[in-house]
UniProtKB/Swiss-Prot annotation:
The protein's name in its UniProt record: Tektin-2
The record's account of how the chain is modified after translation: Tyrosine phosphorylated. Ubiquitinated, leading to its degradation. Deubiquitinated by USP16, promoting its stability.
Cellular compartments annotated: Cytoplasm, Cytoskeleton, Cilium axoneme; Cytoplasm, Cytoskeleton, Flagellum axoneme; Cytoplasm, Cytoskeleton, Microtubule organizing center
GO cellular component labels: axonemal A tubule inner sheath; axonemal microtubule; microtubule cytoskeleton; microtubule organizing center; sperm flagellum
Lineage, broadest ranks: Eukaryota, Metazoa, Chordata, Craniata, Vertebrata
Keyword Phosphoprotein attached: yes
Single biological process term from Gene Ontology: flagellated sperm motility
Gene from which the chain derives: Tekt2
Coiled-coil stretches noted in the UniProt entry, renumbered to this chain: 75-162, 226-380
InterPro entries hit by this protein: Tektin-like (IPR048256), Tektins (IPR000435)
PANTHER family attached to this UniProt entry: TEKTIN, TEKTIN-2
Organism field: Rattus norvegicus
The protein's role, per its UniProt record: Microtubule inner protein (MIP) part of the dynein-decorated doublet microtubules (DMTs) in cilia and flagellar axoneme. Plays a key role in the assembly or attachment of the inner dynein arm to microtubules in sperm flagella and tracheal cilia. Forms filamentous polymers in the walls of ciliary and flagellar microtubules.
Keywords tagged on the record: Cell projection, Cilium, Coiled coil, Cytoplasm, Cytoskeleton, Flagellum, Microtubule, Phosphoprotein, Ubl conjugation
Length: 430
């Protein structure tokens, strides 16, 4: 017979069972509702975050593109500014070279003026005079020294401004390189997408790097460099204009002084030639007067000798008549006539000797004055030769060096050329 075997365990009541089933069903409904709510919220969050992420990425991509455009515009402005700056540096360098050449060209007129002054120191005696030519030559030296000082100052200004432009160029180049590097980085960032390789999380990417600047500071920095470059380029243009003006003015001043000096030279030469002609005329007349005076002296001496013979004749007659005998030794008319003749001859001879002495003195005076005239002629000849040599030397200022051939040869023999009247006169004096 079968027996009932029950497991010894707790028995739940039906109400507990029903309650449990109800609770399970209710909790399942509640959990599903909560899960549904969470799923809806997750979908909303996903949609919102996706939209936000897409918008943020699009917004930042747009900002990055705009930033690239901004940096690129500044880079292009820097490109143009650097091109203009390089052109201005070249122009200012050429202007500096021009003023250096102009300064170097002033050495020739200075050497010529000093050579003329030195050459004119060879004047002799009374011709060593501070005449208008010397004053103009000294003024020419002063003008050249003043122009050289002005040009040297312009060279210094150009050099200093070139250094400043080079410094600005280095700053612009540095800024330009930074912007090129920035463009490369930003364009690389713009080209990145979700499928790009090497995407990874970084350590603290939102940190603010050291020495970061604000957008205003960035804009002010580049704008300051560009404005400074524009200002200095404008100043460089003005400096080039002043350099060109200084070169033109100094050349005009030097040319005006050269014309004035050479005019004074020509005027002085005409004065010397006029005086030389006057001295030659005086020399000719003096020589003629000396010749006539010498002829008169010879005639006077001859007459004096004849008067002496007449006196000897009268003396001999008187002496001979003293030997008349006895009463024949009378003082007759012949005696008185011979005595009067002796007195007359003695007076005549005395007067003639005085006149002869005066004539000799006059001849000596003429010879002395002739010597002074001839010495002055020699001085004038020497001075004219020196001034003519100076005029020939000054041809270097208007004739190119490769075409310059001296026309006056003062110190060496002149060959295959007719001597000038000045040299002919010098040879006559020698």
């Amino acid at each position: 017979m079968a027996t009932l075997s029950l497991k010894p365990s707790q028995r739940y009541r039906l109400s507990d069972w029903l309650t449990n089933s109800y609770l399970l069903s209710t909790n399942a409904e509640r959990q599903r509702d909560a899960s549904h709510q969470i799923r809806q919220e997750a979908r909303i969050l996903r949609n919102e975050t996706n939209n936000q992420t897409v918008w943020d990425e699009h917004d930042n991509r747009t900002r990055l593109a705009e930033r690239i455009d901004t940096v690129n515009r500044w880079k292009e402005m820097l490109d143009k500014c650097l091109t203009d700056l390089d052109a201005e540096i070249d122009s200012l360098t050429q202007a500096k070279e021009s003023v250096e050449q102009s300064l170097q060209a002033k050495n020739l007129p200075l050497d010529v003026a000093i050579e003329c002054l030195t050459l004119r120191e060879s004047r002799r005696d009374i011709d060593v005079v501070k005449d208008p030519v010397e004053e103009e030559l000294m003024k020419e030296v002063e003008v050249i020294e003043a122009t050289k000082k002005v040009l040297q100052e312009k060279i210094s200004q150009a050099f200093q401004h070139l250094c400043l432009l080079q410094e600005i160029r280095q700053q612009l180049n540095s800024d330009h390189r930074d912007k090129m590097e920035t463009l490369e980085i930003d364009r690389g960032c713009l080209s990145l997408n979700l499928t790009a390789p090497n995407l990874s999380l970084k350590v603290n990417p939102t940190r603010v790097p050291k020495d970061s600047t604000t957008l205003q500071e960035w804009d002010d920095f580049t704008r300051f460099n560009k404005n400074r470059a524009d200002t200095e380029m404008k100043a460089s243009i003005e400096l080039r204009e002043t350099i060109a003006l200084a070169i033109a003015q100094t050349n005009n001043e030097l040319e005006a002084q050269r014309v004035a000096t050479e005019f004074t030279f020509r005027k002085r030469l005409r004065e010397m030639e006029s005086l030389y002609s006057e001295l030659k005329w005086q020399e000719k007349n003096t020589l003629e007067e000396i010749a006539e005076l010498q002829a008169d002296i010879r005639r006077l001496e001859e007459d004096l000798r004849r008067k002496m013979m007449n006196l000897k004749l009268a003396h001999t007659r008187l002496e001979s008549r003293t030997y008349r005998p006895n009463v024949e030794l009378c003082r007759d008319q012949t005696q008185y006539g011979l005595i009067d003749e002796v007195h007359q001859l003695e007076a005549t001879i005395s007067i003639m000797k005085q006149k002869l002495a005066q004539t000799q003195d006059a001849l000596d005076a003429l010879f002395k004055h002739l010597a002074r005239i001839q010495a002055d002629i020699a001085c004038k000849t020497n001075t004219m030769l020196l001034d003519t040599k100076c005029m020939d030397i000054r041809r270097k200022l208007t004739v190119p060096a490769e075409k310059f051939v001296p026309q006056v040869d003062t110190f060496t023999r002149t060959t295959n050329r007719t001597l000038s009247p000045l040299k002919t006169c010098q040879l006559e004096l020698n």
